[in-house]
Amino acid sequence: MRLPLPVRVADHEPLLDCSYFDAGLCRSCTLLKTPQDTQLAGKQALAESLLAPFAGRADVWEAPWASSREAFRNKVKLVVTGTATKPNLGIIGPGGRGQDLRDCPLPTPGIQLATPALAQFIAECGFRPYDHTNDRGVLKFVIVTESPTGELMIRFVARRRGVRGMLFKMLGRLRELVPAARVVSLNVQPERKAVLEGSEEILISAQSTLPMTLDVSGQPVTLNLRPQSFFQTNTDAAQVLYSRAVEWVHDVVGSSSRRSGSLRGAAKPVTAWDLYCGVGGFGLALAGAGMRVIGVEAQEQAVGAARESVEEMRAAGLDVEADFVAADATEWARAESSRQGAGPGVMRAGGLGAGPDVVVVNPPRRGIGRDLAEWIAGSGVDTVLYSSCNVRSMAADLAAMRDFEVVKAQVVDMFAHTEHFETVALLKRARG
């Protein structure tokens, strides 16, 4: 089922100009020739149709959030092709040829500025681009992330760790070419297959984290990204998602205790479990608003970054109650509810170590899966905040959750000019 989008261009509406698309050299932005309001209308129509069976009321949908047309993508994964003296940074284009995309209009300004300098740096280091057709060469990708303050994380993905010596030697030169470089690392991916990165990460810089300070409902929340951590690729969209979580959860759980945007002061502290928490975006936003939070994430590096953010919040004088655990979300939720002596389903609500008032899930594209959906359905939780980059898997999960209905929802255009988008929904257990 594809988006119901016409490809006709409206004469009155300006479109994003891209020479790569016009020349047929890159078609990653499949909807580039569709007006952005038409793109968004199609995404809204698809989300409404798929979630209609679970909507508790006709007016659950807020107006969709529209992304900037350009310069919104805070992370790029650039394939390194060409030669050691003249590298290209971009994609594998038509016919399997490397296509340089240093003038792509989608990345944030700092990434656009850094890309030509990174190509020069690679040439000065003499790194031979990896050729997947003959398994020769060394440098596979360069992954660049920009923070809201303009600092960069630069990751070089190579087939062997031997290039680290040159990276250490040339770090000063890299910072001359790219002054915004804060975190620099080498990822080792030795295998000859379509895998972006490997498990081994070698820090080249002294700094190990990229601070991402966001505006969440008017309050600053700083997340710390480590090289292998996940973060949404559109910073403005991430701020919208976290703000909706704080606002919507307050509306249904903490309306009697809010003080200046806070959930503090409730007779019974409001507790949330943030499953698939990543570096803690949703959980830290809720903790900053006064909730007690436990975040669960399989990737230990992300959990370490989330804990670092908690310590920084406390050092800044914020009274936050949050903990983050490295574990599989489904296994942890089942084990925790059993540990409390409430069996696999109903749990006690209350303190930081007790069952939650709210469950937050922000899973990968495949969704939370039947096991976790059925656990939520059988638990005593009444409120779920579900954020999804795949509304189809979200609908399948809601079907497995049975008694929950959508009471608030919004389409967030995280990935402009493509068929992909984020959907955030507040779910309540239906009564009667």
Short names for language-model regions:
Residues 74, 152, 269-270:
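Nucleotide donor/acceptor-binding cores
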Residues 81, 144, 150-159, 222-226, ...:
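Short, aliphatic-rich beta-strand segments
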Residues 90-94, 155, 306:
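Short, acidic/hydrophobic/Gly-rich beta-strand patch recurrent on exposed beta strands
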Residues 5-11, 15-16, 25-135, 143-149, ...:
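Extended interfacial segments that mediate partner engagement and assembly in macromolecular machines
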Residues 88-90, 153, 385:
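General beta-strand recognition
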Residues 1-8, 163-168, 172-432:
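Rossmann-like S-adenosyl-L-methionine
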Residues 83-87, 148-151, 216-220, 317:
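Short, solvent-exposed loop/turn segments that connect beta-strands within catalytic domains
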Residues 138-139, 373:
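Mid-to-C-terminal catalytic/tRNA-binding core of tRNA(Ile)-lysidine synthase
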